[in-house]
Regions:
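Alpha/beta-hydrolase-fold catalytic nucleophile elbow
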Residues: 72, 106-107
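Conserved SGNH/GDSL esterase-like catalytic core that processes O-acyl groups on lipids
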Residues: 22-91, 112-120
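Surface-exposed amphipathic alpha-helices with a cationic face
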Residues: 93-97
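A short helix->loop->beta-strand "cap" motif at the edges of active sites that frequently abuts
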Residues: 98-102
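N-terminal secretory signal peptides that target proteins for export/translocation
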Residues: 1-2
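Bacterial N-terminal signal peptides
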Residues: 5-16
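Catalytic His-Asp segment of secreted/periplasmic serine-dependent ester chemistry enzymes
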Residues: 111-220
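Sec/Tat signal peptide C-region and signal peptidase I cleavage site
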Residues: 17-21
Length: 220
């Protein structure tokens, strides 16, 4: 090895490592759309996504490998009483693992509806099934989220304060640092975020979310 090559090699070894910014993204149903309003990260969430219909599998192919993915999923299954989800859950977990994603599963939240009992049952099923699977499961079925001051008029979705509460809980469970704006607690910002979502896409998601809330066919 020449003296010049040796110097180059030593310089590479001695160079300090550069920290790579971690990527955070949101997938899942329209509750996930709302959570993204608070998180302000790239989102692939959309209306009517459920465990049983498998649409989230395509969403999980979108984030970059190694990203931390916050996935809101289960509400559209609870509304119809679809509780036999073991096979679909295993497929979701394996898809995330194949993409080397760190999956943070945000469970179905408490709802102001008669089918809230299904929410509780599905939440328990998911917590049990995901144990030891390398997934961070964040329960949202507790009564504190049924506070009407946090909810939209349909009793299923949330207002900005509610989505912020959910995001704060999910971020804390995942160990993701958030900073609350000084003037309001409704706009948390994640450090080192790979922001790719445009204002236009944000507006389109907002319109679609509101339309789904008013139609009342599928909760999200």
């Amino acid at each position: 090895m020449s003296f010049r090559c040796l110097l180059v090699a030593l310089a590479v070894v001695a160079a300090p490592s550069v920290a790579v910014a971690e990527s955070y993204e949101v997938v899942g149903d329209s509750i996930g759309v709302g959570i993204d309003w608070a998180a302000k990260v790239p989102s692939h969430a959309r209306n009517s996504v459920a465990i049983c219909n498998g649409w989230v599998l395509q969403q999980l192919l979108e984030p970059p490998r190694g990203a931390t993915v916050f996935m809101s999923l289960g509400t559209n299954d609870a509304v119809g009483g679809a509780l036999n989800v073991k096979q679909q859950v295993d497929k979701i977990v394996s898809t995330a693992a194949a993409q080397e994603l760190r999956l943070v599963w945000i469970g179905p939240p408490c709802v102001l509806k008669p089918w809230n009992e299904n929410v509780k049952k599905l939440d328990a099923i998911l917590r049990e099934q995901l144990q030891g699977k390398g997934v961070t499961y964040v329960t949202m079925s507790d009564p504190s989220l049924c506070d009407r001051s946090l909810r939209a008029g349909d009793g299923v979705h949330f207002n900005m304060a509610g989505y912020t509460r959910m995001w704060q809980r999910a971020a804390a469970a995942a160990g993701v640092p958030i900073v609350l704006a000084a003037k309001t607690a409704s706009e948390p910002v994640v450090h080192h975020i790979r922001k790719t979502a445009s204002k236009k896409s944000y507006k389109n998601r907002h319109v679609a979310h509101i339309a789904a809330t008013t139609k009342g066919s599928s909760p999200n």
